[in-house]
């Protein structure tokens, strides 16, 4: 019973998705609430502040655990490594509030969809639903399944038939009202938060609360000037933060506001058409699509087709054709039926419909799938409102440092209590002085130190047309050691040039037709396929669409006409009408009419159309796509026997190859054709030939890849193109260096009696180029020893092989990835999966792509860079308006500079706190302190200015062959802080003790007598000193002393010293002297300090609360400070920052990197049987118990999650939908 109670107390929300949460049920407890109220009053609101910072404590203090079905409060916890908590209240919706009677009979469904969550969640006879809202999404409690479920969307369990039949005629008015109440409005409302609320949120930040406590303490002790300076800076910081947040809020509000005000037309069951505001739409409504139209929801197309621009979501400005969901008589969920191609049926919220094409049976119709924040645009806005925190070691290390400094402060607190109590100081003053020492160790600007470098880096990136929507990732860019590139449009030019066609006849390839002659393709079925099999549209008299389709169409010299003009002539509702142009080859065909289109998809690697030649009664099917894929759908007798060799002869030269196929449909009825399934259309085709296109490297590609290679940054190609083409491009770009071996990894799925297999195939002839062909060795079940150069090898594989290895040879995957360079024919889901696998090997991964099919991978990478002409693409954290890969080294350079700057500022502020802590400990021993203006100069004139300008040093123009340290807790950094702390401690203690040994030294309160007694030992400016020292008693005795006079210039120069030595330039930043403002400030601070030290002006000494000393003592102070500078600089520059020395130490003591990829590289380097060459290995999951190659199975590898072979893609978030 108790176990069931515990089980009912907890459930998972969004199980298996990226935003998965644990939910715990709680019930308010009046006695506990009363105790918390009393405690809040007694602590003057302090407890409420703690509850604000820790919502889980509030729930635990005020509530008692209970089953979720009885809970009135829920506690939510993220399942990621951050374990963040949220508190939400459960509320009830009562259907009795509706204007019409609602059925109270148990057997009657509330909505037409009997499997709807609404039906299952309804509590009868009260007719209520228990709900909660989490990050703008509404959930209802499903008592049958004992969990909260989303509302505001149609269930994925609906089949194609369900969507057409259940929702095809629209919803009744009553069902619409029920859904509106339960699902909420179809609105993406971003509140413009009032300024007072933003101010309160900023002020209640723990950092500002600590700062307020510190400033209150300092003001109470008369530190007016410094406190006022900090208050002014804090107010400016808060105002700027509030202004920035307010502006972001306004921009986001304006971005989504128009979405909520669209007028739409829907079909209401038994009533017909009805116009209403888009915020009243509910899942299941039938939406009528007019011409140009901005979509206010996600909807699935059920009748007609349309062309949409999805640039707002993906950064891809190419129009995308959407086709209706087929009517299939099966119970399979519609997304599973359509596989990854389901996106071709879905219209996403926020995209623009630019053209509609009715089917001839009425207007273009779509069923509303998701509304409000459940939509694609809603997901995007939520990702901005609730960004996922970054798991970067730097930030966790920084927190540990702050905790360490706070512990020092606590030790200082008890030290001060002991000293002041020992001297008999009143308790009030004792506690006050102890608290002051507590605040010394944690500088108020410390939390902001890690972001200052990012601000400067972001500005410099913007000048280079690289825009950033996630500044926290800039530091991560400094750690990148592997960059993945898409091929087409990234490494190679966007545009493809036509090289020629290779037609087939009688099962043989014919002579190639070259486009270099300027002649169009002669009329043939191949020409008809090139003219009709594409997704081009005519928009405002201009043909628009995919660049490949445009080039192919231009090669025919045919033209496209507006379908509306000629639709009557051909007697049918058509998509496109294509006619021969003036320069086209002579054709017996007057026109080609495309009637139906099965769009291209990355996962399917093909597209096809159903067309009709003018004057004919039957129809034709034309297909184009990846040659290997198209050949699979053709009759074997029509595919030339030398097809693989012919294909390879072009792909090894870097050509892009497209295959075309055709068949005739013996049907005379258009309605029969329109309802044909894609599987039936795309079968038994005749192979027509190959279309050869050139895809040239961008001129910047080779230079950038060389620069990354010299910086020892791995480069990998992830593309949807042919494997041979990808390998050739990798070689031509020198991603695969000359002389390296290429091993193709080809894996096959298990069959009935044969287990999964993986074949290792060596590409023999490495010298390739135009006119040269590669030779492949015979593959057998034997191992071939490595030849010369075997230590430099690169694996290449296709997406299909990657998927098989992922499932059946998982232990092989890391071994392949550490040397994998080319991954071809990869689907969007596989690209994201590959990025995640690289990250599991502890690589810091960058991804550069065009932002369309790569959006999932761009989001998954540590630094995703989208090449887009838009200023900021939401497909990735970084967007480059310069559409070549030069942005990659720029970003890495700035990331390294920002990371080093953050470390430098952090080290400086840590040393600042320690130096001040040491001097405070020494002075507290004699109940003394530095004066207000002494602190003011150190804290404002030096420290604050250093923090603001230290990070503005530009990045070094050349990438170093190693990365900066990525951890604050690394040995060089810890040693740097430790040794500098020791230097400071030794110098300060020595000076503190040595000044007491001087013959002219005396206690502060004896100063005047002391001066007269030791007059002969002072400097010659006796008369000047005598004129003002008599008033020394006006200065508080706890400040004016020889100890403060000695320690202040030493510590001040020490601050300048650590600021200088922590501002190292090369190899990651330019030299310090190039940072003019910072250099000037350091020199000015040093000059001012020396001037004050040696000046004999009464106004200066009175103002700075110093005692004049003999010149030799001042010279000694300066010599000591400069000696400390020299020692600290030598240690920092020649030892701690000496990369070669640390490598030598690591080798001598046997220290190795703990990164997984380093471990695997070391293991494989010692394995004489790796890499396997020209052999086949089998998995152990076959029925006949095949041999497993034990050399490649590692028990150290943790089994990873499996890819779904026939199901949905691995991403569960918004990007998977795109």
UniProtKB/Swiss-Prot annotation:
CDD domains reported in the protein's UniProt record: P-type_ATPase_cation
Residues annotated as transmembrane: 33-53, 222-242, 401-421, 433-453, 903-923, 940-956, 973-993, 1042-1062, 1077-1097, 1115-1135
Organism domain of life: Eukaryota
Positions contributing to Mg(2+) binding: 850, 854
PROSITE patterns for this protein: ATPASE_E1_E2
GO molecular function: ATP binding; ATP hydrolysis activity; ATPase-coupled monoatomic cation transmembrane transporter activity; metal ion binding; P-type ion transporter activity; polyamine transmembrane transporter activity
Record-annotated active site: 486
GO cellular component: late endosome membrane; plasma membrane
Residues the record marks as carrying a glycan: 540, 669, 819
Catalytic activity: ATP + H2O = ADP + phosphate + H(+)
UniProt cross-references to InterPro entries, sorted A to Z: ATPase_P-typ_cation-transptr_N (IPR004014), ATPase_P-typ_cyto_dom_N (IPR023299), ATPase_P-typ_P_site (IPR018303), ATPase_P-typ_TM_dom_sf (IPR023298), ATPase_P-typ_transduc_dom_A_sf (IPR008250), HAD-like_sf (IPR036412), HAD_sf (IPR023214), P-type_TPase_V (IPR006544)
Membrane protein topology class: Multi-pass membrane protein
Compartment(s): Membrane
Keywords from the named record: ATP-binding, Glycoprotein, Magnesium, Membrane, Metal-binding, Nucleotide-binding, Translocase, Transmembrane, Transmembrane helix
Listed EC numbers: 7.2.2.-
One Gene Ontology biological process: intracellular calcium ion homeostasis
Predominant place of localization: membrane
Family: Belongs to the cation transport ATPase (P-type) (TC 3.A.3) family. Type V subfamily.
NCBIfam families to which the protein is assigned, alphabetical: ATPase_P-type, P-ATPase-V
Record-given protein name: Probable cation-transporting ATPase 13A5
Species of the source: Homo sapiens
């Amino acid at each position: 019973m108790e176990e069931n109670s515990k089980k009912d107390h907890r459930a998972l929300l969004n199980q298996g998705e990226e935003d998965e949460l644990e939910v715990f049920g709680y019930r308010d407890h009046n006695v506990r609430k009363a105790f918390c109220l009393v405690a809040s009053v007694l602590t003057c609101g302090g407890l409420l502040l703690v509850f604000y910072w820790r919502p889980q404590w509030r729930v635990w203090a005020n509530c008692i655990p209970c089953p979720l079905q009885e809970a009135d409060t829920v506690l939510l916890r993220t399942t990621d490594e951050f374990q963040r908590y949220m508190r939400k209240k459960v509320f009830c919706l009562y259907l009795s509030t509706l204007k019409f009677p609602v059925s109270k009979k148990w057997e009657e469904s509330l909505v037409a969809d009997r499997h709807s969550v609404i039906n299952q969640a309804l509590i009868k006879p009260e007719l209520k639903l228990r709900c909660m809202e989490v990050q703008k999404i509404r959930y209802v409690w499903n008592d049958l399944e004992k969990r909260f479920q989303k509302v505001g969307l149609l269930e994925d369990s609906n089949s194609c038939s369900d969507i057409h039949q259940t929702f095809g005629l629209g919803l009744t008015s009553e069902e619409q009202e029920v859904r509106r109440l339960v699902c909420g409005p179809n609105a993406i409302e971003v509140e413009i938060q009032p300024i007072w609320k933003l101010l309160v949120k900023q002020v209640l930040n723990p950092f500002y609360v600590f700062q307020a406590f510190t400033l209150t303490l300092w003001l109470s002790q008369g530190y007016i000037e410094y406190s006022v300076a900090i208050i002014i800076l804090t107010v400016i910081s808060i105002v700027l933060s509030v202004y920035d947040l307010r502006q972001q809020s306004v921009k986001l509000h304006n971005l989504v506001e128009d979405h909520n005000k669209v007028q739409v037309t829907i079909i209401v069951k038994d009533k017909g058409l009805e116009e209403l505001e888009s915020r009243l739409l509910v899942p299941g409504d039938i939406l009528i699509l007019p011409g140009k139209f901005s979509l206010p929801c996600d909807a699935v197309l059920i009748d007609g087709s349309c062309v949409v621009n999805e640039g707002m979501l993906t950064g891809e400005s190419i129009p995308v054709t959407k086709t209706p969901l087929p009517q299939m008589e099966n119970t399979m969920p519609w997304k599973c039926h359509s596989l990854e191609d389901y996106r071709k049926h879905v219209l996403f919220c926020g995209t623009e419909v630019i053209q509609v094409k009715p089917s001839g049976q009425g207007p273009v119709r779509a069923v509303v799938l998701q509304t409000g924040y459940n939509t694609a645009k809603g997901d995007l806005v939520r990702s901005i409102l609730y960004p996922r925190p970054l798991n970067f070691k730097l930030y966790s290390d920084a927190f540990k440092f702050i905790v360490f400094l706070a512990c020092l402060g606590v030790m200082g607190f008890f030290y001060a209590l002991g000293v002041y109590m020992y001297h008999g100081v009143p308790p009030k003053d004792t506690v006050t002085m102890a608290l002051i020492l507590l605040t010394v160790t944690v500088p108020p600007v410390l939390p902001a130190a890690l972001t200052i470098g990012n601000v400067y880096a972001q500005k410099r990136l913007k000048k280079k047309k690289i825009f950033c929507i996630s500044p926290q990732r800039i530091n991560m860019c400094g750690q990148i050691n592997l960059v993945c590139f898409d091929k087409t449009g990234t490494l190679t030019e966007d545009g493809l040039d036509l090289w020629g066609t290779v037609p087939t006849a009688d099962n043989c390839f014919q002579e190639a037709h070259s486009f270099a002659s300027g002649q169009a393709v002669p009329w043939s079925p191949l020409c008809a396929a090139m003219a009709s099999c594409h997704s081009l549209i005519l928009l405002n008299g201009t043909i628009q669409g995919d660049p490949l389709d445009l080039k192919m169409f231009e090669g025919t010299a045919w033209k496209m006409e507006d379908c509306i003009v000629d639709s009557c002539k051909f007697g049918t509702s058509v998509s496109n009408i294509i006619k021969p142009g003036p320069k086209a080859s002579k054709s017996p065909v007057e026109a080609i009419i495309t009637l139906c289109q099965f769009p291209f998809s990355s996962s399917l690697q093909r597209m096809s159309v159903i067309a009709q030649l003018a004057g004919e009664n039957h129809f034709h099917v034309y297909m184009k796509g990846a040659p290997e894929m198209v050949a699979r759908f053709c009759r074997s007798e029509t595919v030339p026997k030398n097809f693989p060799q012919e294909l390879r002869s072009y792909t090894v030269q870097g050509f892009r190859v497209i295959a075309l196929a055709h068949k005739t449909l013996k049907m005379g009825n258009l309605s029969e054709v329109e309802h044909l399934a894609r599987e039936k259309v795309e079968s038994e085709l005749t192979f027509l030939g190959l279309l050869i296109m050139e895809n040239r490297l961008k001129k910047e590609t080779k230079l950038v890849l060389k620069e990354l290679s010299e910086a020892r940054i791995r480069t990998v190609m992830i593309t949807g193109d042919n494997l041979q083409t990808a390998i050739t491009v990798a070689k031509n770009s020198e991603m695969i260096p000359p002389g390296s071996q290429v091993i193709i990894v080809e894996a096959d799925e298990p069959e009935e009696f044969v287990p999964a297999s993986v074949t290792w195939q060596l590409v023999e002839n490495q010298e390739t180029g135009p006119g040269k062909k590669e030779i492949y060795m015979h593959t057998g079940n034997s191992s071939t020893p490595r030849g010369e150069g075997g230590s430099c090898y690169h694996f290449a594989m296709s997406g299909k092989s990657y998927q098989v290895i992922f499932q059946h040879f998982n232990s092989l995957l890391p071994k392949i990835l550490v040397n994998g360079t080319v991954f071809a024919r990869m689907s969007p889901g596989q690209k994201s999966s590959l990025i995640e696998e690289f990250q599991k090997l502890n690589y810091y991964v960058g991804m550069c792509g065009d932002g369309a099919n790569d959006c999932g991978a761009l989001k998954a990478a540590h630094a995703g860079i989208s090449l887009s002409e838009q200023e900021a693409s939401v497909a990735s954290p970084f967007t480059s308006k310069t559409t070549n890969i030069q942005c990659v080294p720029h970003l890495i350079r700035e990331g390294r500079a920002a990371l080093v700057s953050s470390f430098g500022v952090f080290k400086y502020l840590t040393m600042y706190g320690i130096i001040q802590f040491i001097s405070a400990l020494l002075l507290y021993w004699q109940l003394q302190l530095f004066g207000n203006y002494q602190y003011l100069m150190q804290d404002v004139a030096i420290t604050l200015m250093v923090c603001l300008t230290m990070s503005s040093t530009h990045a070094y123009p050349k990438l170093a062959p190693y990365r900066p340290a990525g951890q604050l807790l690394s040995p060089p950094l810890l040693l740097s802080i430790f040794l500098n702390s020791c230097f400071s401690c030794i110098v300060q203690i020595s000076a503190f003790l040595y000044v007491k040994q001087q013959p002219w030294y005396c206690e502060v309160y004896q100063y005047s007598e002391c001066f007269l007694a030791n007059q002969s030992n002072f400097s010659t400016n006796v008369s000047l000193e005598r004129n003002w020292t008599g008033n020394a008693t006006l200065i508080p005795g706890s400040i004016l002393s020889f100890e403060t006079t000695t320690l202040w210039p030493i510590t001040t120069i020490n601050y300048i010293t650590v600021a200088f030595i922590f501002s190292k330039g090369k190899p990651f930043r330019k030299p310090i002297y190039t940072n003019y403002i910072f250099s000037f400030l350091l020199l000015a601070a040093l000059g001012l300090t020396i001037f004050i030290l040696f000046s004999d002006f009464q106004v200066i000494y009175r103002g700075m609360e110093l005692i004049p000393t003999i010149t030799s003592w001042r010279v000694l102070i300066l010599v000591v400070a400069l000696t400390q500078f020299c020692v600290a600089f030598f240690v920092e520059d020649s030892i701690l920052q000496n990369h070669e020395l640390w490598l030598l130490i690591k080798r001598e003591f046997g220290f190795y990197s703990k990164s997984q990829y380093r471990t695997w590289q070391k293991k494989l380097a010692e394995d004489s049987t790796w890499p396997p060459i020209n052999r086949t290995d089998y998995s152990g999951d076959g029925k006949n118990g095949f041999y497993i190659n034990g050399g490649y199975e590692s028990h150290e590898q943790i089994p990873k999650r499996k890819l779904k072979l026939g199901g949905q893609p691995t991403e569960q978030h918004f990007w998977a939908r795109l």
